[in-house]
Amino acid sequence: CLVGSEMCIRDSTSIALKIHFPLAWAVKPTLYKQFVGGETLQDCSAAINHLMKYNVKSTLDYSAESEQTPEGIQATFEETLRSIDFAKGNTNLAYAVFKPSTITTDELLAKASEKREELTIDDVRHFREFRERFMALCQRAYDNDVRILVDAEDYCFQDAIDALTDEAMRKFNKKRAIVFATLQMYRHDRMPYLRRIYDDAVAKGYIAGVKFVRGAYMEAERARAAALDYPDPICKDKQATDENYDAAVRFTMDHLDRFEMFMGTHNEESNYKLAKLMDEKGIARDDSRVFFAQLLGMSDNISFNLAHAGYNVTKYVPYASVRDVLPYLIRRAEENTSVAGQTSRELRMLEMEMTRRKEHNPAEGR
């Protein structure tokens, strides 16, 4: 079972990290090479240039899972600033991105979002510092004219993130979308939230940036909801999630005068539906307000074929040292347990992509 193998890899890697076992020799030429752009921004140049051969832009994602200490948080914040500066004026790079939980602590995000207990004086101070870092990243993106994606997090963190993202969009998105909220459409409350974003954008005169994903923490979210006795935030089944996702995309396309959209999915049907919808609405395939996106090393046949057809496409390109990015690779394996059926599809797609490359350039297949 491939998923079982992934879980075995995850468990073995977790143990190896704890005992400081050297893993780079095994990981770097395999998983790391497939899914990671390099250790530094400069190291990603080869991946960026390779993708641009197929008219696919890159979105560099600093994926180090630093400890949530003041030093670790500051280091991640500073590296994210560098990634925004690196993207300035670079037409090969489509967006910058950051994960809010890397510039604060999980505990603070949960307390601020769930409001189950009063924030202490220290909590209030730390949240103010988090807000300052959050807004500083958005300000740097605005100053550099670089669009920035605010990644979604666990349900118990998201309310605080949504509030800051809404605030940042009102401030920085007056003329175009700079700041993008991420909506995990396996949450059944995201369509009402999308409509609130639209109403707010109309009322306050800004362009909302939205990134759509399905979501990757289904088992954990349901388990936590059951343990703490609150309503399950996840759609009842995959069909309901797909319908929610499709509804969000259509709503956004119906109101594109107030939106820019980043569609992050490896689902072939979702990509096809959006491409078809753009053509039906007479929206140019290269309209800068709409981007398709996949992860580096996954669904290349979707990415390259869309780009070849003239649509805007970007790849998330993670970067960090081998050791620091291992938790990201472990999470990829964990997330795949939620979409076990996709594994065989990815293998078929990989075979298709290898065949396509051999036909396009026989030397590349050797």
What are these regions, as identified by a protein language model?
Residues 5-6, 10-366:
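Positively charged, amphipathic and often flexible ligand-engagement surfaces
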